[in-house]
Amino acid sequence: MDFHYTSEKNIQIVLALLKANGIRKVIASPGATNESIVASMQYDPYFEMYSCVDERSAAYMACGMAAESGERIVLSCTGATSSRNYMPGLTEAYYRHLPILTITSSMDTNKVGHLYPQCTDRSTPPADTVVASYCIETIKDDDDEWDCTIKVNNAISDLRYNGGGPVHLNLITKGCNDYSVKQLPKVRIVKRIGYGDTFPPL
């Protein structure tokens, strides 16, 4: 079987927007729920991948890489309580204004609270761990695709907006094993424009 990108459209959009914004360094902690995004990143030589089995250590690695390189760094972990291990490092990143995009893969949010194993509520992270948090749902139609594109653009923008800091994406995944997609979709970069900024030419 040829191995390319996952067929999950929301993950494709995340990857395409990371590339379009020049974000390439990824620290991945192994797991089942984040398999689709990590495997797709490993297929693409654009991404500079680092592996760290312990999420607490991975978060501090991201702090160091962001501080030293000045680049935006991606963290990826599986579902369940593994994402909680990011919190000490993200707290440091929050107070140091380090641009770390934390992608926690997850089952559908409607399974939270119904005794599904390894399924936790990530809708309200502690106030001093991230500057913003977004849930990236599975894409079923054009409206879902638009919503996904806007949220991921917002998340990337938030990494450096008003001083910046860590941002959380809760990425819903079905755990698809179809890696037949050879090309990422074309995506639209949405730039934030504030007072005093120059609008792009029409």
What are the roles of these predicted feature ranges?
Residues 1-202:
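N-terminal alpha/beta PP-like core and its mobile active-site loop of ThDP/TPP-dependent enzymes
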